[in-house]
């Protein structure tokens, strides 16, 4: 179900943070975010519960945790300014909410890039039925 929702969002052309985050992921991993990470493991994609399946999935878990610490805005839809410079992602917004969301996305994209060698096709389009709430970790 979450896979269908993610695909629907991308097909509708929703602008905002999801698009920007996808560009960061592509920059750091070389992989298209929508097809590689939109439903990867238990945490990459919309929602998340259970135990992270590998280091790449743990990056998404940490990203979800980061979003829970962002107050007074909608992280998944907040637009922010950033740029790529000499291989780095630079968040350039002075608004505290936008800056925090950008930093969450930046850290996750870097983490995914650092763990791209752990990416395992068996976790792509992973069934959420394997991700049980009883095994969920706390942020």
Curated annotation (Swiss-Prot):
SMART domains: PA2c (SM00085)
GO MF entry, a single one: calcium ion binding
SUPFAM superfamilies registered for this protein in UniProt: Phospholipase A2, PLA2
Cofactor(s) this protein requires: Ca(2+)
Binding site for Ca(2+): 43, 45, 47, 64
S-S pairs: 42-131, 44-60, 59-111, 65-139, 66-104, 73-97, 91-102
Gene3D superfamilies named among the record's database cross-references: Phospholipase A2 domain
InterPro entries found in the cross-reference section: PLipase_A2, PLipase_A2_Asp_AS, PLipase_A2_dom, PLipase_A2_dom_sf, PLipase_A2_His_AS
Location within or outside the cell: Secreted
Family listed: Belongs to the phospholipase A2 family. Group II subfamily. D49 sub-subfamily.
Full protein name: Acidic phospholipase A2 5
The species this protein was found in: Echis pyramidum leakeyi (Leakey's carpet viper)
């Amino acid at each position: 179900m979450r896979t269908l929702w993610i695909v629907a969002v991308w097909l509708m052309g929703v602008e905002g943070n999801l698009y920007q985050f996808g560009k960061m992921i592509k920059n750091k991993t070389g992989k298209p975010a929508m097809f590689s990470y939109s439903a990867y493991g238990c945490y990459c994609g919309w929602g998340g519960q259970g135990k992270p399946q590998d280091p790449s999935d743990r990056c998404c878990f940490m990203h979800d945790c980061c979003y829970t610490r962002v107050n007074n805005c909608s992280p998944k839809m907040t637009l922010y300014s950033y740029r790529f410079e000499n291989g780095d992602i630079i968040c350039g917004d002075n608004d505290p909410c936008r800056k925090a969301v950008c930093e969450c996305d930046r850290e996750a994209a870097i983490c995914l890039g650092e763990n791209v060698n752990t990416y395992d096709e068996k976790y792509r389009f992973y069934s959420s039925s394997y991700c049980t709430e009883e095994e969920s970790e706390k942020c």
